[in-house]
Amino acid sequence: MHLQTRAAVVTGAASGIGLALSARFARAGAGVVMADVDGDALHRRAAELTARGAQVTAVTADLTDPEVVERLADTAFDQLGDIDVVCNNAGVLGPVGQPLWEVPLERMRQVFEVNHWAHVLVARAFVPRLLERGRPAHLIHTASMSAFVVGAGSAAYAASKHADLAVARSLRADLRGTGVRVSVLCPGRVDTPMVQGLTAPRGAGGDTSVSAEDVAGLVWEALGSDRFYLFSNSDARIRLRDQFDDVWRHVSLPPPSPEEELWPAPKATTVTMNH
C-alpha cells in the first residue's frame, strides 16, 4: 500500500535528485523540509517551489556536524509535526579518475563525511523520533550503483557508497517489525549537475542515463512498500549480473573437513545474578 505522504524531509535538496524529490513531494501536497549545505542555491530553489504553491521550509545545514543534524530534526518535527518520509540524500562525487594512492587523504575524508557519516547522523537523529511517534514512515538512503560496481579511479566515492549500503542494510534489519521501512536508492548515471562533463570510471560500465525526475518517480512509487533496493537505470540487471557472476566464478571453497563438519555448537552459558 502506498504510504500517505503529508510531510517529508529531504537532504541534499538544493539540486539533482534531492531537488526532484522535494518537488515530487510538494506536488503531491506534502509539506517538505529541504536541507543542504549550499544555502544560497537551496533558498533559491525553495523560493521557486513556494512560488508554485508548495509548502517548503529551507534549512541550511552542514550534515556532517552532529549538533546541526539534531537541530535539523528538531526543526523538521516542529514545522511538520509527524514526518512520513526522510530522504537521506546528501552526497558529493569527490575526486574521480585518480588511483587510490594519489587521492589526497583530506579529500577522501570529506567524501566519507558527506556520503557516509552524514547519513549515519541523519538516521540517528530521525529514527528514534519516528519510532517514538509510532506511525508508518519510510527512510530512503541514496547510495549508488557504485555500491556494487566499481571502476578505476573511483576509490573514494565507491567506498563511501559501499559503506552507506551497509548502513541501510543494517537499519533495515534493526527496524524489521516496526512501522519504519527502509529502502536504498541505487541510481546509475543520472543527468544532474554533479556528473555533467564526466565519463564513467573505467571498468564501472553503465551507459544508460535517466533524469532526476525519473528517480524521484521511482522513489514515490516505492513509498510504503517492502522494496529495499531501488534501481533507476535499465542496465542495472546486466551490471549486477556481471558483478556477481564474477564473484561466483571465484568461489572455489574446498569441501568441509570432518573436523569442521563435527565442530560443536557453542554451549549456552547460564549466568546467576546476585541481588
Curated annotation (Swiss-Prot):
InterPro entries: HdxpentlteDhPtlF, NAD(P)-bd_dom_sf, Sc_DH/Rdtase_CS, SDR_fam
Keywords, in A-Z order: Antibiotic biosynthesis, NAD, Oxidoreductase
Protein name: 1-deoxy-11-beta-hydroxypentalenate dehydrogenase
Record-level Gene Ontology MF annotations: oxidoreductase activity
Annotated Gene3D superfamilies: NAD(P)-binding Rossmann-like Domain
Gene encoding the protein: penF
Family per record: Belongs to the short-chain dehydrogenases/reductases (SDR) family.
Catalytic activity from the UniProt record: 1-deoxy-11beta-hydroxypentalenate + NAD(+) = 1-deoxy-11-oxopentalenate + NADH + H(+)
Phylogenetic lineage: Bacteria, Bacillati, Actinomycetota, Actinomycetes, Kitasatosporales
Residues that bind NAD(+): 12-36, 161
